Amino acid sequence: MRRSLSLLLGSLLLTVGLLVGAQPSWAYPFWAQQNYDSPREATGKIVCANCHLAKKLTQVEVPQSVMPDTVFKAVVKVPYDTDVQQVGADGNRTALNVGAVVMLPDGYTLAPQDRLSDELKEETEGIYYTQYSDDQPNILLVGPLPGDEHQELVFPILAPDPKTDSSISYGKTQIHVGGNRGRGQVYPTGEKSNNTVYTASVAGDITAITGGDAGASVVTIAGDDGNVEETIPAGPALVVAVGDSVDAGEALTDDPNVGGFGQMDAEVVLQNPVRLYGLLGFLAAVAIAQIMLVLKKKQIEKVQAAEGV
């Protein structure tokens, strides 16, 4: 019950923040959840890349191996230059936010609060985790969060126990991670955001540049089939002027985007304790055998010395 209330509260807080925040909320993993049954396509691409077109580095750190029914942490790193600012939805400059999606193997879940160490509680303070869906507890989302405070996102993970879940097997499995900083260039509807380059739809001469609604600019291009008006929202800076000639597809603005998305895979081994104990027993036997050989050799040397050999 407590876990359900916690998840509900986290979802409500995230939803409110997304709806009232200055940045378009679809810039973060939360919105992949609204449009895709799974955040990972058959090709291996995480769907966040459909809206975040720029590629940026994302890193993940996980233990090489874990024991059943133990808590470990996956650290997703979303680095960027904190001195830069992005274009907000209203065209003003604003700080970047970050988000991440972690796709764990089946059986792995978010660790419950009462299983976290004091260190993990401190590292995860202020981070709200949500499941991708009710039937996918192994897929976790975080964000948006202030990037200057959360370039490292810690996910506390509970490893499964094959003894209590027969569908889980020991061995090596993969973790898929996606990390994002900043807003997207395309909305889920396919429309451009104001955080991307705007180009000319036709070739021709620019005959006028006028102001539009909410700080937008309207660029009029005289083409072969008449005038075409290109509406540029507040944010991108115009790089053309009246009298310029442009080709179809030529940039009318700069590229204001300073963020981007990256993904990475990692591997984790669910160790079988019996095999581990067997290995430790074998190593102990080898060590004892070596010690016995050394002692036997010294005993022989003493006997030989006593006999004057």
From Swiss-Prot:
It is a single-pass membrane protein. SUPFAM superfamilies: Cytochrome f subunit of the cytochrome b6f complex, transmembrane anchor, Cytochrome f, large domain, Rudiment single hybrid motif. One of its GO terms (biological process) is photosynthesis. It comes from the Bacteria. Its main location: membrane. The chain crosses the membrane at residues 276-296. The keyword Transcription regulation does not apply. Its cofactor is heme. Residues 1-27 form the signal peptide. Pfam families: Apocytochr_F_C, Apocytochr_F_N. One of its GO terms (cellular component) is plasma membrane-derived thylakoid membrane. Binds 1 heme group covalently. GO terms for molecular function: electron transfer activity; heme binding; iron ion binding. Heme binds at Y28, C48, C51, H52. InterPro entries: Cyt-f_TM, Cyt_f, Cyt_f_lg_dom, Cyt_f_lg_dom_sf, Rudment_hybrid_motif. The keyword Transmembrane helix applies. Keywords: Electron transport, Heme, Iron, Membrane, Metal-binding, Photosynthesis, Signal, Thylakoid, Transmembrane, Transmembrane helix, Transport. It is found in: Cellular thylakoid membrane. Component of the cytochrome b6-f complex, which mediates electron transfer between photosystem II (PSII) and photosystem I (PSI), cyclic electron flow around PSI, and state transitions. Belongs to the cytochrome f family. HAMAP family: Cytb6_f_cytF. The 4 large subunits of the cytochrome b6-f complex are cytochrome b6, subunit IV (17 kDa polypeptide, PetD), cytochrome f and the Rieske protein, while the 4 small subunits are PetG, PetL, PetM and PetN. The complex functions as a dimer. This is Cytochrome f. The gene is petA.
